[in-house]
Amino acid sequence: PRFISVGYVDDTELVRFDSDAENPRYEPRARWMEQVEPEYWERNTQIAKDNEQSSRVDLRTLLRYYNQSAGGSHTIQRMYGCDVGSDGRLLRGYEQVAYDGCDYIALNEDLKTWTAADMAALITKHKWEQAGAAERRRAYLEGACVEWLSRHLKNGNATLLRTDSPKAHVTHHSRPEDKVTLRCWALGFYPADITLTWQLNGEELTQDMELVETRPAGDGTFQKWASVVVPLGKEQYYTCHVYHQGLPKPLTLRWEPPPSAVSNTVIIAVLVVLGAAIVTGAVVAFVMMRRRNTGGKGGDYALAPGSQTSDLSLPDCKVMVHDPHSLA
């Protein structure tokens, strides 16, 4: 089985371990992490390798709990970390475990008790209660987690507290039955929180809007899109609105017809005065050009929603770490 461990502060990846790498080691993914002492990488590489082995045991345990065969693909996901406020104090700690994409067990907000999602998870819950797992996790979340988050914020504040404003545009995609899809794209933004909405004459179209999850662009920024289906010829009544921390004010966009379509229309209008025969030829030429140009300019980048306020003081930040204890 493949084991991957990733650490984040807010939307920025810090460190990564991948058991399928040629030389599996904990590696920095953010530039400021290169300042960390070598002992950190040695220590956490060994922890990751230990966790890889314990995760194999956990996987076999869950296969037994759910009476499943070893064939096929199965996944255990763990996420735990801490949220701190602008004063550096702990706001919330958490640990969540999922199996094959479904909730399994989670640490409650009191950091003292667990919630099991099903009968199999109850077995793990009872074992963890007897072993004092919640107390150990609470000690980590209130101690080392907060300390490391403070250190990351100090070393990486230029990256973590930056804002990259989204670049937005609207594309036009043909559909059958005199309908078109208008898709509003937001690209290259950071942090990931963003809101995209479509409006018709000032009324929000939340029920009729298709929205994708915010996606990483691979360069430290994010992308998202939202689309609506509208009647052909009514595109100008629809507006896309983009809200993001990096914008001085929200963006309002409409679909803009390509310049070639506008210039063709002007040519036809001028030729009309030259006589019926010439007008007929001009109309035929215009229709042919329109057919050649029919279709939207698509793209496979995306844009997505989620609101963020613009606060110049230090925002609340989160850190996620992966250091599992056994489910067995």
UniProtKB/Swiss-Prot annotation:
SS bonds (residue pairs): C82-C145, C184-C240
Start and end residues of each stretch annotated as Alpha-1: 1-71
GO molecular function: peptide antigen binding
Pfam families recorded: C1-set, MHC_I, MHC_I_C
InterPro entries reported for this sequence: Ig-like_dom, Ig-like_dom_sf, Ig-like_fold, Ig/MHC_CS, Ig_C1-set, MHC_class-I_related, MHC_I-like_Ag-recog, MHC_I-like_Ag-recog_sf
Keywords, sorted A to Z: Disulfide bond, Glycoprotein, Immunity, Membrane, MHC I, Phosphoprotein, Transmembrane, Transmembrane helix
Membrane topology: Single-pass type I membrane protein
Annotated region described as Alpha-3, given as residue ranges: 164-255
GO BP terms: antigen processing and presentation of endogenous peptide antigen via MHC class I via ER pathway, TAP-dependent; antigen processing and presentation of exogenous peptide antigen via MHC class I; defense response to bacterium; inner ear development; negative regulation of neuron projection development; positive regulation of T cell mediated cytotoxicity; T cell mediated cytotoxicity
Topological domain ranges for the Extracellular compartment: 1-265
Region (Alpha-2): 72-163
Transmembrane segments: 266-289
The keyword Glycoprotein appears for this protein: yes
Glycan attachment points: N67, N157
Compartment list: Membrane
Record topological domains on the Cytoplasmic side: 290-328
Residues of the Ig-like C1-type domain: 166-252
One GO cellular component term noted in the UniProt record for this chain: lumenal side of endoplasmic reticulum membrane
Region (Connecting peptide) residue spans: 256-265
Chain positions with Phosphoserine modification: S310, S313
Assembly and binders: Heterodimer of an alpha chain and a beta chain (beta-2-microglobulin).
Cited function: Involved in the presentation of foreign antigens to the immune system.
Family label: Belongs to the MHC class I family.
Name of the protein described by the UniProt record: H-2 class I histocompatibility antigen, K-Q alpha chain
Source organism of this protein record: Mus musculus (Mouse)
